[in-house]
């Protein structure tokens, strides 16, 4: 594992300016692969969704997937790119076991989309423009699984297994121009940019956009230069970072590592790096290749593709509401304040709250549950809130039980814990745990008498008009009933008992 010396982030920022660059690979959710009729299905038995084209058998010819081209154009349009009138595929030559043809069919100097931009909103509302160099089509490689090692990497593994189901799956690679001027907000910008790309492709419906499945993967490039210098430093590329937090942490770590190398008077090596989530460090991969090393040349088996302006405009007309406009609409519909809505977006639960409202919850109740209960649990479990396993219908059911007086908020929180533990539905958990609210006034009056007897001075204050002191008595009753009393009803009974009008 990594033994790199690193500088503190603050010290690195005092001395250097970071320059970032991202290559985000988006798997398209087409029914078949990019150049073959083999199914594009995640999770099937290894090496079952493969045919002779994917394996590069002699004499086979590729056929371009039209839906993949349409999806690529839609992505380009959503990224404010220009769509090339003519583009072509190229062969990217390299040998690796997950590439059965010994080349990848990609695009080189004639991509389908180019010269775009994305305006990225940071957590405090600051907008940072990221310029897009290009978005090009290519096919994915197979998947290698390294067995016997401690880290899951090839280093130290006893052997490797290869699954070609992913070989030939259509990809769009989105490449940014160098990103300058982010300063100490570079890690935050990295996370926000990848989140924005993921949101766009999910909104377009062209990708499942599940990072944990590899539908969206990010290669993060980092270099540093001393303050005031224009020339870029040597960059490293951290490959296949597959979560938003990992992107943020990887960029932060690489900034600290580069700063330590430069401070020691040593050269930064242009290389790929591997990210390790458990230690939140990177380790060296291989020397970074330049384009010349891949010996690109035009794909001889595919003719250049012409995207007529009429076709492009037809596709533009099918684009859904852009995410930024959707957020503006939802904020107005839900009546959230600027701060409330920004917190929802930053927590990554916008879709979940929308689904919960669609399932029947009010906007305030949906926000209360996701922000007040679920986000905290997700942080404790170190997962994204949407991956915690809570369904919108569950939130609606819990909220209805509270509204109907069957359980109180404290009990509802316990029921949620039971749902996450797999104990059953909310109704089943309430019954199993005996969590129903005490609705009979008899037991409540007994608990109230005991609480008043234990705190006669508080009872006198309430009789004397200091009604706010009632909280101590209510607390005693709630403790005696193990939180199963209706606090509102308890308060009413206490005031009646003491002959006080609220």
Swiss-Prot record:
GO terms for molecular function: asparaginyl-tRNA synthase (glutamine-hydrolyzing) activity; ATP binding; glutaminyl-tRNA synthase (glutamine-hydrolyzing) activity. It is an enzyme of class 6 (ligase). GO terms for biological process: glutaminyl-tRNAGln biosynthesis via transamidation; translation. The keyword Membrane does not apply. It holds the Pfam family GatB_Yqey. SMART domains: GatB_Yqey. It catalyses: L-glutamyl-tRNA(Gln) + L-glutamine + ATP + H2O = L-glutaminyl-tRNA(Gln) + L-glutamate + ADP + phosphate + H(+); L-aspartyl-tRNA(Asn) + L-glutamine + ATP + H2O = L-asparaginyl-tRNA(Asn) + L-glutamate + ADP + phosphate + 2 H(+). Heterotrimer of A, B and C subunits. Belongs to the GatB/GatE family. GatB subfamily. Allows the formation of correctly charged Asn-tRNA(Asn) or Gln-tRNA(Gln) through the transamidation of misacylated Asp-tRNA(Asn) or Glu-tRNA(Gln) in organisms which lack either or both of asparaginyl-tRNA or glutaminyl-tRNA synthetases. The reaction takes place in the presence of glutamine and ATP through an activated phospho-Asp-tRNA(Asn) or phospho-Glu-tRNA(Gln). This is Aspartyl/glutamyl-tRNA(Asn/Gln) amidotransferase subunit B. It comes from Pseudarthrobacter chlorophenolicus (strain ATCC 700700 / DSM 12829 / CIP 107037 / JCM 12360 / KCTC 9906 / NCIMB 13794 / A6).
């Amino acid at each position: 594992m990594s033994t790199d010396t690193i500088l503190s982030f603050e010290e690195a920022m005092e001395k250097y300016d970071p320059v970032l660059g991202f290559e985000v690979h988006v798997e398209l959710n087409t029914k078949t692969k990019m150049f073959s009729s083999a199914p594009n299905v995640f999770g099937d038995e290894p090496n079952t969704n493969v045919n002779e084209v994917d394996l590069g058998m002699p004499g086979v010819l590729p056929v371009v997937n039209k839906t993949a081209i349409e999806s690529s154009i839609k992505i380009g349009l959503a990224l404010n790119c220009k769509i090339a009138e003519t583009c072509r595929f190229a062969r990217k030559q390299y040998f690796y076991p997950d590439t059965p043809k010994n080349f990848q069919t990609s695009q080189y100097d004639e991509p389908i989309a180019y010269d775009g931009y994305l305006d990225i909103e940071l957590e405090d509302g600051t907008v940072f423009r990221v310029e897009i160099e290009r978005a090009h089509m290519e096919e994915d490689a197979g998947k290698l699984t390294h067995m016997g090692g401690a880290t899951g990497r090839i280093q130290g593994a006893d052997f490797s297994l290869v699954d070609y189901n992913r070989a030939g799956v259509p990809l769009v690679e989105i490449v940014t121009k160098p990103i300058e001027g982010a300063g100490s907000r570079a890690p935050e910008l990295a996370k926000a940019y990848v989140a924005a790309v993921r949101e766009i492709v999910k909104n377009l419906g062209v990708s499942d956009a599940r990072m944990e499945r590899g539908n969206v993967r990010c290669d993060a490039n980092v270099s540093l230069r001393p303050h005031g210098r224009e020339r870029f430093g040597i960059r490293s590329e951290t490959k296949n970072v597959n979560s938003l937090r990992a992107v943020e942490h990887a960029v932060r770590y690489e900034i600290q590592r580069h700063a330590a190398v430069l401070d020691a008077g040593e050269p930064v090596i242009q290389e790929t790096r591997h990210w390790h989530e458990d230690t939140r460090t990177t380790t060296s991969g291989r020397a970074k290749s330049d384009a010349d090393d891949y010996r690109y040349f035009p794909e001889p088996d595919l003719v250049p593709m012409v995207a007529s302006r009429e076709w492009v405009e037809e596709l533009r007309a099918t684009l859904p509401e852009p995410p930024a406009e959707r957020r503006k609409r939802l904020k107005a519909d839900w009546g959230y304040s600027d701060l409330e809505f920004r917190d929802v977006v930053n927590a990554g639960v916008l879709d979940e709250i929308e689904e919960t409202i669609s399932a029947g919850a009010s906007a305030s109740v949906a926000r209360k549950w996701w922000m007040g209960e679920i986000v905290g649990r997700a942080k404790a479990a170190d997962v994204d809130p949407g991956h915690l396993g809570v369904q919108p219908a569950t939130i609606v059911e819990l909220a209805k039980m509270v509204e109907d007086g069957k359980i109180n908020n404290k009990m509802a929180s316990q029921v949620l814990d039971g749902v996450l533990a797999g104990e059953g539905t909310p109704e089943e958990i309430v019954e199993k745990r005996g969590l129903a609210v005490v609705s009979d006034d008899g037991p409540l009056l007994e608990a109230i008498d005991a609480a008043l007897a234990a705190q006669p001075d508080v009872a006198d204050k309430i009789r004397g008009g200091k009604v706010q002191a009632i909280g101590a008595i209510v607390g005693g009753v709630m403790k005696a009933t193990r939180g199963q009393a209706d606090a509102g009803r308890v308060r009413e009974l206490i005031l009646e008992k003491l002959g006080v009008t609220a």
